[in-house]
Amino acid sequence: MDTRTTVLITGASTGIGAVYAQRFAQRGHNLVLVARDSTRLEALATKLRSEHNVAVDILQADLTQISDLTTVEARLRDDASIGILVNNAGAAQSGSFIEQSTDSVAHLVSLNTTALVRLASAIAPRLVQAGDGAIINIGSVVGLAPEFGMSVYGATKAFVLFLSQGLSLELSPKGVYVQAVLPAATRTEIWERAGIDINTLNEIMEVAELVDAALVGFDRREPVTIPPLQEEARWDALQAARQGLLGQIKQSQVAERYQDLA
């Protein structure tokens, strides 16, 4: 992959997105930074232009608004210099399912899933045609564990993982790398925006450590990168168990335990 390939990063004004911008700029990539806060975007862009001598464009966009989303989609479809998409924009929310309003649930699903898949859909055909490029989707370990109690948020992140794994199977033979990154709790503003006190969390990872680890996985071309997972064999075992389960599914035959034995 050309080191000068432009990288488009959503949710780029702070946190994980901003650190991705810094790291890709350090690698010599030009950038397109997308977020709602134009003041923060411009400050980051100015800093990166000065420190790394790269071109940085900014797109102010709220990806839950269809007009803004279509603008970013058009940039991904039409700008042939963009070879890497970092689908980072996302949100969380506090409270149990019955405490969350219908509107807040719809907003969360729109940002965490609809925007992400539409942006991937906008760039993927062009990357396949080029036979090169990458899509990085930021998920969460919460998507593996309904036990964490964040049902809607976790469901959106389970979607991100499933989509990423499916796209990897579809697109990697055509030269396009797809990576799912699954952080655990990371020190970003997402917690405050969700109404969650970060100080109540027992453990939390620093953003720079998370992104640096994710980029190790990126360079290794891992389809799924889980920086907080200490034993890689655990993930391998989970995938092996999943494959074994699939082998037990008989599409034309009801399992014996559900048959009327009376």
Provide a role label for each language-model segment.
Residues 11-15:
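Conserved glycine-rich cofactor-binding loop
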Residues 27-44:
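Conserved glycine-rich Rossmann-like NAD(P)H-binding loop of the short-chain dehydrogenase/reductase
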Residues 88-93:
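Conserved NAD(P)H cofactor-binding loop of Rossmann-fold oxidoreductase domains
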Residues 96-98, 104-107:
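Substrate-binding pocket helix/loop in short-chain dehydrogenase/reductase
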Residues 120, 156:
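Active-site helix of classical SDR
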Residues 140:
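Residue(s) in the substrate-gating loop at a strand-loop-helix junction
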Residues 180, 196-235:
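C-terminal helical subdomain
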